[in-house]
Amino acid sequence: MAALSGVRWLTRALVSAGNPGAWRGLSTSAAAHAASRSQAEDVRVEGSFPVTMLPGDGVGPELMHAVKEVFKAAAVPVEFQEHHLSEVQNMASEEKLEQVLSSMKENKVAIIGKIHTPMEYKGELASYDMRLRRKLDLFANVVHVKSLPGYMTRHNNLDLVIIREQTEGEYSSLEHESARGVIECLKIVTRAKSQRIAKFAFDYATKKGRGKVTAVHKANIMKLGDGLFLQCCEEVAELYPKIKFETMIIDNCCMQLVQNPYQFDVLVMPNLYGNIIDNLAAGLVGGAGVVPGESYSAEYAVFETGARHPFAQAVGRNIANPTAMLLSASNMLRHLNLEYHSSMIADAVKKVIKVGKVRTRDMGGYSTTTDFIKSVIGHLQTKGS
């Protein structure tokens, strides 16, 4: 236990040094790569970096199995603390939610699957997924939509980032029946949170060397709510004169993404729009199975798939695509300053796709999840030091 405690301290020290604020560590270097390898060797002696794992519903457990198998083969110095929370498998309760929150607050870093939200109203409007994000204040969801070399789609060589505010908006769980047959749903937009996500987007663009931020809105109709969001983005944009700033109405944005997605660089938007655009953009490069995502607060980082789908119809069929989850796991390792292991895993996944011999059904192939995992591990083993 003393050794594990020491590792927890080391984890936080490394994350703090590289990431002042959970979402700030956005750059890497050759020196960091070498340091990662050295740190990993030291940590293996004492223990491992503790990370909370929440498999979720649908194919989530199968995807997490893929992560664990690849991490084991790559000798990644991470210890997963696994918890289970599900509203559809009768595995959800206040006690379980608090256990998950406690683990995530202790470890600061988590990797999660999709927690499926039932459509039936059972007395609680806020899903466990939403409550988890609110309690950790995971205000920024980041989805990097990038084409995978070797996998041809209608649009190739895409590289854009979608940043979504995910603690308010239409996901505020404020609904009521004002009269029989009349439901009112409240959308909450605040200046503080709109400014915060706008600043996050411009900081991200600056640190990643990106040249443009597009604010997506519907201020022509929701003049006060989206008007406030747009105003905050415009105010923040003035503080970043080197970053080009544009605005676009959400419906036009959907059309432009399909017709000419190359015009976009970084997009920032309120909650519901981000959920829709995440999925639309994922479809441009191969679908939900290939796009990684992550969510940040000032203190915590959670890694997940970019398009959140439980894919329940595939459970137990060994056909789920682990690409998105493995790339997300690679991003998690980079966040922990384990650059060596992060690059090793990402390179192996991309090599499997580029070679093209092993592809799951969603990518037009006939390979199983197990086939894909074995192929990734095989490319790990043949990777040079």
Swiss-Prot record:
It holds the Pfam family Iso_dh. InterPro entries: IsoCit/isopropylmalate_DH_CS (IPR019818), Isocitrate_DH_NAD (IPR004434), IsoPropMal-DH-like_dom (IPR024084). The heterotetramer and the heterodimer composed of IDH3A and IDH3G subunits can be allosterically activated by citrate (CIT) or/and ADP, and the two activators can act independently or synergistically. The heterodimer composed of IDH3A and IDH3B subunits cannot be allosterically regulated and the allosteric regulation of the heterotetramer is through the IDH3G subunit and not the IDH3B subunit. Keywords: Acetylation, Disease variant, Mitochondrion, Retinitis pigmentosa, Transit peptide, Tricarboxylic acid cycle. Residues 1-34 form a transit peptide. One of its GO terms (molecular function) is isocitrate dehydrogenase (NAD+) activity. PROSITE patterns: IDH_IMDH. The modification N6-acetyllysine is found at residue 199. It is found in: Mitochondrion. It comes from the Eukaryota. One of its GO terms (biological process) is isocitrate metabolic process. GO terms for cellular component: isocitrate dehydrogenase complex (NAD+); mitochondrial matrix; mitochondrion; nucleus. NCBIfam families: mito_nad_idh (TIGR00175). Plays a structural role to facilitate the assembly and ensure the full activity of the enzyme catalyzing the decarboxylation of isocitrate (ICT) into alpha-ketoglutarate. The heterodimer composed of the alpha (IDH3A) and beta (IDH3B) subunits and the heterodimer composed of the alpha (IDH3A) and gamma (IDH3G) subunits, have considerable basal activity but the full activity of the heterotetramer (containing two subunits of IDH3A, one of IDH3B and one of IDH3G) requires the assembly and cooperative function of both heterodimers. It is linked to Retinitis pigmentosa 46: A retinal dystrophy belonging to the group of pigmentary retinopathies. Retinitis pigmentosa is characterized by retinal pigment deposits visible on fundus examination and primary loss of rod photoreceptor cells followed by secondary loss of cone photoreceptors. Patients typically have night vision blindness and loss of midperipheral visual field. As their condition progresses, they lose their far peripheral visual field and eventually central vision as well. Belongs to the isocitrate and isopropylmalate dehydrogenases family. This is Isocitrate dehydrogenase [NAD] subunit beta, mitochondrial. The gene is IDH3B.
